[in-house]
Amino acid sequence: MDSFQFFEWLLRDIERNLLYTSLVYTNPKIAIVRYEPSENAKLWRSKELNTDSPNELLLTLKKTLDECSTLDEKIETLLRIRYFTVYVGDKSDKRNIIRSWLSTTINRLNVEEYASIQEIELQAKQWRAENAKSLRPYHYNIPINEYLRDNEIEVLDTGDNRWKSDTLQGLLPNFYHRTHTLIGAILFAVTSRLEIYSYEQKKALRYLLRTIEKCYNEGYLEMSRDRKWSHTLPELRTLTFRLYNSKVIHAACAMISLVHANPIDYEFLCQVVAVYQIIPANAAKLLSTPMTLYVGVATFSSNQVASTGNASECAPLQIENNIYVSEAQKKEWAESFKSDPLNKSRMLKLMNENLNTTLDKFSLIFNCFSSTFHVGHRIDNAQDAITDQVTATYTSNVNREMYDSYYYKLKQMLKEEIVQYVEDHVAKQYKDVTAESLSALANSSNGFSKEVKFIDRNIKTTKKILHLDNDLITNDYSDLSKALSHGIPMGTRNVPARQTRGIFILPWQVAAVQHTIAESLYKRAKKGAYQGSFAEAYTAKTASLTYGVLAEDTSKATKIILYTDVSQWDASQHNTEPYRSAWINAIREARAELKWRYDDEPKVLEMNVLDSMIKIQEYLLNSNLVVASPGSQRPTKIIRYHGVASGEKTTKIGNSFANVALIETVLDFAKTDIPDLEISHLRVDGDDNVVSINTSCTIDRLQRIIKEKYSSLNARVKALASYTGLEMAKRFIICGKIFERGAIPIFTAERPYGTDVSIQSMCGSSIYSSAVNAYRGFGDAYFSFMQDVLVPPSASTRITGRLRVLMSPVTLYATGPLSFEITPQGLGGRCRFFTQSAKLFTLFKMLTQTAAVSITPDEIKKYAETVQFKKRTEVMIASMQRKLLVPAKALARIIVDKEQQKTLGVPNVQSQKNRSQVSKAIEILGVPERNDIVAKGYYPEELYSLIISHSVVVYTSHSTPISIYRVNCEPVELLRSQLGIRIADSKPIAKPTNHLYDIVSGLSPIKISPSDLLTQAKKYDLSTYKGKRDYLSDLGLVGNTLKTYLASKMLFRDLLMSKYDDLYSTPGFGATQLTTIPLDVTSAEKVFSIRLGLPPHLYEVVMLLLLYEYIHYVFSCKRTFTAQMHAISQEQSAVITKNIILMLDNIQLDQVSFSDDAW
């Protein structure tokens, strides 16, 4: 941010955090701790500083600021504030403060109520009565005492606050602040905006706040961070508050935040909460369902899209799009609108009125759709959910001919893959794949608990890595049937609007065996095997563009687009016996046809990979699922199951293969009824599939035939067909525009947060999620509201019971254990400050670095010395050396380092690490500024400021281009208009090749990153020939490769490339917001022109650094410019170049911790 904006932002944030403190605590006392030299080491211990109330302190601060004559002095005053100490006399009445604050706020919103709420409540109650059979007791929002009276089996009483209940724990929102803290933060953010709300917004706010008040006053169940419940069971048996009260409060808070989204329908938000109170487990699903059909019948005018047929290349044209909706589709919509159980829903009414609509109106409806997911995660009891999931009923009347065709297709595909897999390994003489397979094991659960030795003590643990180490020592692992004979334990995943899903927890042997096969399948799918019908072939860095072909089809409306959804895919019949036998017979046939030597087949820990794969498949044909519910008195259930096990390494890619075989079989047989069926595009992604079809057949007949063909394979499907819109993998493509739902719930979480992460880092990830929601549709006002809610409660850290430290916003938006690790604009990294003043910048650096500490726990170091750990790394290193035929000491060290990091997955080790980091950071806060503490390294801003100070800056404005990818975010639109829109996943034109990294990653069996090369390089004296040579041969380079590389003098250049590799590898430094903007050297040259004699690879690095800083500038200042360097003399040029090279050697890049999983 430039100085003025930085000052405004800093002051506003400080003011907001102080005001929040004054509102939620009874007369807190606050003092400022400044950066001023002082003798006393523990400055914040002295209490007499705590004199002012927050408001008095703000007045004094503002007075001081008014007395400053220049902007720099004002900024200096604020940057000298290191943190505030907050002393709270009495905390017990915080809940009461919030209760009275709630009622005063409601009274200030004196507007009328909505009428339509009762209508939809009535419909929800009707639905509940009609579907009573399929609902469990905990799906009803009934008083807690009734629930406990009728469901004793669901709880285990311990006589105190530590009783257990899986089911009741699923009714907690799992937010990392107490519920009353969240209400306080919401009220704080709402109160500060009361003057600017419209009448409609006030109506919605009043309804939502009254809902919160009702639940808050009734009471609710809560669990503290140390896993104690707020009530004991005997207390609960006398209380009448409802089961879902705390979840309703959180859902209402989410809807209040969405009142700030633009565009949105306020009344619909209230309806969501109304329905949620009646049918909490089904509200989101029922309210969001109509979208799938609507996207196929709705149309609006936009532009045609041209694509090259290559998935990631598409561009909008100036021609208007074609629109076509058949009568059959309209009829289908009318029927489903009539029969929808909740057709009083505002969203459904809007849909019905807007079948022919505009882009803006569609965006409003789409935002309403996204909002239904914000009621939060649905969490069912694992036993109930898994039983529902795996029991699919089959009939025996299948079409044998189709079945055989499906089985044969699948077997042929898998056989081809296996042949390819073995041949690749034989050709490279790469037999022992142990190192690769073991390094890919994550330290997750192994399914059952086992007593193992950990350093100096025996612990019971379920962690894969510790089981593996123990099995290696006892040499008891190669009998797969023994490992699988315990049955397969189940874990769960919770998502909004869907029933809880089971996850199979398979023993580590399965993951190790399947790893290399899965890798090989993925690799081939990525290269576009089978006409590129796998979504994996489209894992471009910009997944948004991979839908180019579909965007084209929907904008031209000449093809029928068929999207099918197989219900209960994993448990369907075609996934049972045929899927498993296809694997088994594919392996047997591949072996029979090609006579390679049995000894040459890949092995993991001396187990033959293909033999073991057959064993696994045979076992899974008839497996026992063990479903326990430890927090209840339910007995453990054992279920026989034959379907696909989600939890295998090959699940997703195996599903995709089965899906291709299935859809091709269905289409082949459909051709007998529809001779002119021509397929122009087929895409599968796990169990989703989409096909574009040219045919003269009518749309309703096509749907009917496809459904028949599926059901003769015994697969139950929803087959939807349309000309102008479809849904795939949670993205909606309509009329040539791509929409993504902003459906990340912020105030609920899938699981309880661990005690081992600081509140700040959790808050950081919430801010990031809110930024993504805002960017995908809710807009900038929603994001600023979310920050007002999330930041103030997380801005302070507890020191003792009554003393808290409120940190400076600069420290909060930096990196480290007490920081959000995100910028105030929602990009990953730390906040930016652009200034020409060295003194201010040093203060800024001090603030960003005060709390940045990283500690390696002792237990990691200790475990690395044990026999168990050494055995695992020895096995891996030996396997690597068998592949490379040289000792490769540096690679061996990389293996050891990577394996050491896995020890963090052991319970308590991660907690230990985080706790010690937090306490260390707090300790550092206690040390005043000493003269010998100097801020380390250069920040990229300094490079940016250096260039800008020698350039002519011209502010520009550009016309907005037509976009295919829908966003609601001003800075992104500005950047797109200046830099254009990424239309292909093109490599930055001349990304210099890092030869060393390419050579080593080709040799190494484990995945390595450029930073690993850098770490190892520090251990050698690279100024001598011998040092260089040792370094390279330790990385595994031999013979000619080694000689040629040494002679090419490229080592230092490649190491520099390794250091800046992050600049190239993260499109938009991992932030979703930037994936559609081309961030490469070409773009940088549109903004900056530098006239300096820099060597080409340095020139690129400098340009990219400048571009990234420029992006931060646009995000915070919302304006664009171009900067051209002055004509300067040779001497000046030499001085600047020297400065730049000095900076590049010591620059500190952000470590970004949030990148969106979707990409």
Swiss-Prot record:
Residues 545-727 form the RdRp catalytic domain. It holds the Pfam family RdRP_4. Its EC number is 2.7.7.48. GO terms for cellular component: virion component. InterPro entries: DNA/RNA_pol_sf, RNA-dir_pol_luteovirus, RNA-dir_pol_reovirus. It catalyses: RNA(n) + a ribonucleoside 5'-triphosphate = RNA(n+1) + diphosphate. The keyword rRNA-binding does not apply. Keywords: Nucleotide-binding, Nucleotidyltransferase, RNA-binding, RNA-directed RNA polymerase, Transferase, Viral RNA replication, Virion. GO terms for biological process: DNA-templated transcription; viral genome replication. It is found in: Virion. GO terms for molecular function: nucleotide binding; RNA binding; RNA-directed RNA polymerase activity. It is an enzyme of class 2 (transferase). Belongs to the reoviridae RNA-directed RNA polymerase family. Interacts with VP3 (Potential). Interacts with VP2 (Potential). Interacts with NSP5; this interaction is probably necessary for the formation of functional virus factories. RNA-directed RNA polymerase that is involved in both transcription and genome replication. Together with VP3 capping enzyme, forms an enzyme complex positioned near the channels situated at each of the five-fold vertices of the core. Following infection, the outermost layer of the virus is lost, leaving a double-layered particle (DLP) made up of the core and VP6 shell. VP1 then catalyzes the transcription of fully conservative plus-strand genomic RNAs that are extruded through the DLP's channels into the cytoplasm where they function as mRNAs for translation of viral proteins. This is RNA-directed RNA polymerase. It comes from Rotavirus B (isolate RVB/Rat/United States/IDIR/1984/G1P[X]).
